[in-house]
Amino acid sequence: MAFQMVTQYAHSPEDIDHYNTDELRQQFLMAEIFVPGDIRLTYTYNDRMIFGGVTPTTTPLEIKLDQQLGVDYFLQRRELGFINIGGAGTVTIDGTTSDVAPHDGYYISMGTQSVIFASTDAKHPAKFYVVSTPAHRAYPSKQLAFKDTLAMPMGDQAHMNKRTIYKYIDASTMATCQLQMGYTVLAPGNSWNTMPAHTHARRMETYLYTEFGDPNTRVAHFLGTPENTKHIWLEPDQAVVNPSYSIHCGVGTTNYAFIWAMCGENQTYDDMDAVDMHDLR
């Protein structure tokens, strides 16, 4: 097993104003997430979220970050959520094993001492997209079947943003310390996500772009302040960090899906500030 965790520091809008393309990608993009047999994580100082991919093949994988986090075990002071976007797999939580079908997920409580990920078929491995945030108390762990998610149709064909938002971890349906997580699927023939744009000063957010409608699909993701936007081109299964001051929207050459995850001081989903189209630069 290879384990890799990189650190991305927090930056002010004035800092990123001077970044060239390579610098912007280095500071906000996670390019390699699902590597067979590996764990690939990013620790962003934006609200101290840890996110990335766990891709077990022949051997189960466990995230161990006690030394890096100054704790006795990974989730001693953290909670964790994941969504499986690969083949069938299992997760063993403190000795209890559960099946995890494609597109199913899990919320795992602070205080959980062992989380072991495995694939049912090594030739078609599970791809666990994991997100962990700081926690102050333990809430019950919960298995999250895709069929039970809260589905929200959004947008329309005329604006090329017809999509369905599937809420997995949401304050309206379950208790967490701060983690929110979901999966958005664009309908065929649609390309824009989160447009009109918004910001939410009390939360940061990561996007994992996945399930592209065509192998050659690419997504241009926009971030930065509304009056000074930047863009990053993403390939399948790449993720981007959006600071709390930043817009976060994208447009693809065909349809696609993405997993969003948020954390911060406010869990109200609608706590956001809309950006007028005339203000975008």
UniProtKB/Swiss-Prot annotation:
EC number in record: 5.3.1.17
Gene Ontology process terms (BP): D-galacturonate catabolic process; D-glucuronate catabolic process; pectin catabolic process
Family as reported in the entry's similarity comment: Belongs to the KduI family.
Gene3D superfamilies xref list: Jelly Rolls, pectin degrading enzyme 5-keto 4- deoxyuronate isomerase, domain 1
Signal peptide: none
Tagged with keyword Zinc: yes
Protein name (Swiss-Prot/TrEMBL): 4-deoxy-L-threo-5-hexosulose-uronate ketol-isomerase
Keywords, sorted A to Z: Isomerase, Metal-binding, Zinc
Superkingdom of this protein's organism: Bacteria
Catalytic activity: 5-dehydro-4-deoxy-D-glucuronate = 3-deoxy-D-glycero-2,5-hexodiulosonate
CDD domains in the cross-refs: cupin_KduI_C, cupin_KduI_N
Protein's job: Catalyzes the isomerization of 5-dehydro-4-deoxy-D-glucuronate to 3-deoxy-D-glycero-2,5-hexodiulosonate.
Pathway: Glycan metabolism; pectin degradation; 2-dehydro-3-deoxy-D-gluconate from pectin: step 4/5
Residue sites binding Zn(2+) per the record: H198, H200, E205, H248
GO molecular function: 4-deoxy-L-threo-5-hexosulose-uronate ketol-isomerase activity; zinc ion binding
Any matching Pfam family: KduI
Cofactor remark from the record: Binds 1 zinc ion per subunit.
Cofactor(s) named in the record: Zn(2+)
